[in-house]
Every structure is written in C-alpha cells, then in structure tokens.
Design a protein with these regions (language model features):
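Acidic/polar-rich alpha-helix caps and helix-coil junctions
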Residues: 1-20, 30-195
Length: 195
C-alpha cells in the first residue's frame, strides 16, 4: 500500500529505514504562516513517533503529510485527483495563457486556505508552481511538471546521493528520459531510438 511506503507512522522497513523528506530548499519557500509547514518536521526530532525503533531513522524535514491508520495498519485514503490540483492547474493555465487576473483570482482563492497571510506580489507563475510543488509533494506529479516545462531536477541540500543516485539532472540529459525498449525499436521501424 502507498501508506506502507509513504506514511510516517506505519511500522515498515520502508518507513523506518527509508524516511521520506521534503527538499529543505522547497520547505524554506513556505512562509511562516503557511499551514502546510506542519506536513514536515524541519528538526527531525519527533517526540511522538509511534515506536522507539522509528527514532533511529528520524531525519530533518521528515514527512508528516501522510498518516496511516495505525502502526500496524497501513490503510489510508489515496486521492488520485485532488481538488487542489485542479485549482493549481487552472491558475497555471490562465497565467500561462495571459489571463493574469483570472489566474490570480483562482490562485488567491486556493492559497489563502493554505496560507491565511498570503498577499501575492511575486511572479505569479513562480508562486503557482512553488505552491504546486509543496501541495502535491510525493503525489507523483513533480517529474511530469519538470518534463513538460523542460526544467532541471535539483534535489537540494538535505539529500544523500547514496540513496538517490544523483542530486541534479539537466533537462533532456541521458538517463532523465524513459527509454523506449530496444525490442520495440528493433521491431517497429516507425519508432525512433531515444537511448
């Protein structure tokens, strides 16, 4: 289950030894009044971890976004499409399409529910994309955002290359595109190799 891998409180090796954490640089983009800050612990000193065995693997910026039903029950709701994603997608589409007023209206309506002190004023598209990155953290969308926008992957200062293979990857770089299997390119002459 997703919660057996991603929650902070279910007792599984994937959680105790493979702790999930937000990029510290992304965390720092949130204002002090952003309610989503509670989804992570920047100190890594959880006093309320369900078992003492969890404490050995506790790290700064550890996930608190996903909570399983219990230490021995990995059940949890998995949202395949969230309303917040629709708000952020609409705001981005209007902003990129030149309708800044509509984009700001939609984004502000969404953002004040996360950050009551939100007042805007920055680059609107950047604000939308930052909020999208925070809101949809670990929900499987970041890779596709980077690919569609042609942006580089930068993991940040709190990642260990031992566990993630690389810390940075340039857009379009080899190993950053899903390769079409060789058997497909060998047998389908209309399919071009991308490896």
């Amino acid at each position: 289950s997703f919660y057996a891998y991603m929650s902070w409180n279910f007792s599984s090796t994937a959680i105790r030894q493979g702790v999930k954490a937000i990029n510290a640089d992304t965390y720092d983009l949130m204002s002090e009044t952003d309610l989503r800050r509670a989804w992570w612990d920047p100190t890594g000193s959880y006093d309320d971890l369900p078992l003492t065995s969890f404490q050995a693997g506790s790290i700064p910026y550890q996930n608190r976004k996903f909570t399983a039903r219990a230490v021995s029950n990995a059940v949890g709701d998995v949202a395949f499409l969230r309303l917040s994603e629709m708000y952020l997608t609409a705001a981005e589409a209007y902003a990129r399409g030149g309708n800044t007023a509509k984009a700001q209206e939609i984004f502000t309506k969404f953002q004040v529910t996360r950050d009551p002190a939100y007042a805007g004023g920055g680059d609107l598209i950047e604000e939308i994309m930052t909020s999208r990155r925070i809101e949809l953290w670990a929900e499987g969308l970041r890779y596709f955002d980077l690919k569609r926008l042609g942006e580089d992957l930068v993991r940040g200062r709190n990642f260990d290359v031992t566990f993630c293979t690389f810390l940075e990857k340039k857009a379009g770089e080899k190993g950053w595109t899903w390769e079409i299997p060789k058997i497909e390119t060998d047998n389908n002459k209309l399919c071009e190799k991308n490896y």
